[in-house]
A protein has these predicted regions:
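Surface-exposed, low-hydrophobicity beta-strand/loop segments enriched in small/polar/acidic residues
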Residues: 2-106
Length: 106
């Protein structure tokens, strides 16, 4: 069982592949080390795919890979158990058949 994480924040919405960003002091900034607790995505077609690398580019270790949905306008929601998934460097998100992605992180 994980600990109670009380400082969860929503990322800046991604509409295409890119580094996960947060809002700090009213500005969008690339996130460094973080822990993804859950994700929400909106699909543009069947088989939406999300790959998240522990890096600032798609060259890093893949820590999350999800595929789901059967039609356009489906949503894909996933909650990671325990303390979520830790990214030591940053979180680079690759999206396919998805036009909106938000991660909830600590």
């Amino acid at each position: 069982m994980g600990t109670n994480i009380s400082d969860v924040k929503a990322s800046i919405e991604l509409t295409s592949t890119g580094q996960l960003q947060g809002s700090i002091g009213g500005s969008s900034v690339d996130l460094g080390p973080c822990r993804i607790i859950s994700i929400n995505a909106h699909l543009t077609g069947a088989d939406g795919e999300i790959t998240i690398h522990d890096n600032t580019s798609a060259a890093g270790v893949i820590k999350i890979h999800l595929k789901g949905g059967s039609a356009s306008n489906d949503t894909l929601n996933f909650n990671f158990g325990g303390n979520g998934v830790h990214f030591a460097t940053g979180a680079y998100v690759t999206l396919a058949a998805i036009d909106s992605f938000t991660a909830y992180y600590a």
